[in-house]
Structures are given as structure tokens and as C-alpha cells.
A protein has these predicted regions:
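Acidic, metal-coordinating catalytic segment for phosphate/diphosphate chemistry
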Residues: 34-42
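Residue-level detector of alpha-helix boundaries and kinks
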Residues: 10, 37, 112-113
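Sensory/regulatory domains in signal-transduction proteins
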Residues: 46-161
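Short, low-complexity N-terminal regulatory "tails/caps" that precede and couple sensory modules
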Residues: 1-33
Length: 161
């Protein structure tokens, strides 16, 4: 079995975040994010083919804004970053500067409506390569007290530019 040091997505904090991501998605879209399985949710979400990311609840206009709190294996591969580098970085760094205004507008809309579907935008990987995401879904994350504590996004439709 993989140790938590080798599998940071299996730490108690990451497991709780995976549960918030999955429950927030189900609440927002009235269906599960990933198919139910006998494996632990945190492992299944990390291994999912769909790209899944989440950031904390810092204000979009506060300093560097929200920081990533989760990225599954598909996200890590797409952005070309390891967990330790991706998780904790400002989420705005997933997009190039020219795209950050439209990204921030979509996040604000999703925050106001609790969820949106059909978002498209251009992102940038670690090496500066640009890629288009299409039909992304964005939703609010909720803590145990029912307060908004971040946002998540998923998509499977993307291509290099």
C-alpha cells in the first residue's frame, strides 16, 4: 500500500477536501462527480480521468487570491506539476495574465450562482504551453457548518493551442 508521504492526496486534509469536492458537485449538479466504487473516494477522485482542481475561499480580489487546495492526477499531468508544487500555489497562476480577468469573472459568477456549467477558457502549463479548456463545470465547496469555503472545477474537454 502507498504511504501518505508518497500519496499526499491520502492525508486527512486531502481526504476531507476530496469529500467536499464530491459532495459540493453532487449538491450543485444533482449527480455524482465520479461513479461510485468500493475504493476510497479520495483515491478514486485522484485517479479519475476527468481533470479536477479546487481552491480555498480567499477573496478573488484579496492579494494573490485563492490558493489551490487540490489537484488530481489528471490536473497534475496537464499542468506538468507535482502535487507539492501545484497545491498551495495561487490558482490564478493556472492561467496566463491575459486570461485572468475572464477567469475571475467566471469564478465570481460561479460563486454568486453556486455553480456554472459550460465554461471555456485558455490555461497555461508549467512550461508556458497554452491549452483550451471547454465545457468546464465550476461549483462552490461547503464546510461542515454550511459555509462556502472554496470552489472546484472539472473538465475533460481540452486541447493544446
Amino acid at each position: 500500500m502507498t504511504s501518505q508521504a508518497a500519496a499526499p492526496w491520502l492525508t486527512p486534509e486531502a481526504i476531507a477536501t476530496a469529500e467536499q469536492i464530491a459532495s459540493g458537485y453532487a449538491q450543485a449538479f444533482d449527480r455524482p462527480l465520479i461513479a461510485p466504487s468500493n475504493a476510497p473516494l479520495a483515491q478514486e477522485l485522484f485517479a479519475a480521468a476527468i481533470v479536477v482542481l479546487a481552491h480555498d475561499g480567499r477573496a478573488l480580489n484579496q492579494g494573490e487570491g485563492p490558493r489551490l487546495i487540490y489537484a488530481n492526477r489528471s490536473a497534475l499531468r496537464l499542468w506538468g506539476r507535482p502535487w507539492a508544487e501545484m497545491v498551495g500555489m495561487p490558482s490564478k497562476n493556472t492561467a496566463e495574465p491575459a486570461e485572468q480577468t475572464s477567469r475571475q469573472q467566471a469564478l465570481a459568477t460561479a460563486q454568486h450562482q453556486n455553480a456554472i456549467s459550460g465554461y471555456s477558457g485558455i490555461r497555461i502549463d508549467r512550461q508556458g504551453r497554452r491549452f483550451q479548456i471547454n465545457r468546464a463545470q465550476l461549483w462552490t465547496l461547503w464546510n461542515a457548518s454550511g459555509e462556502a469555503c472554496g470552489q472546484a472545477a472539472c473538465f475533460s474537454d481540452w486541447w493544446w493551442l
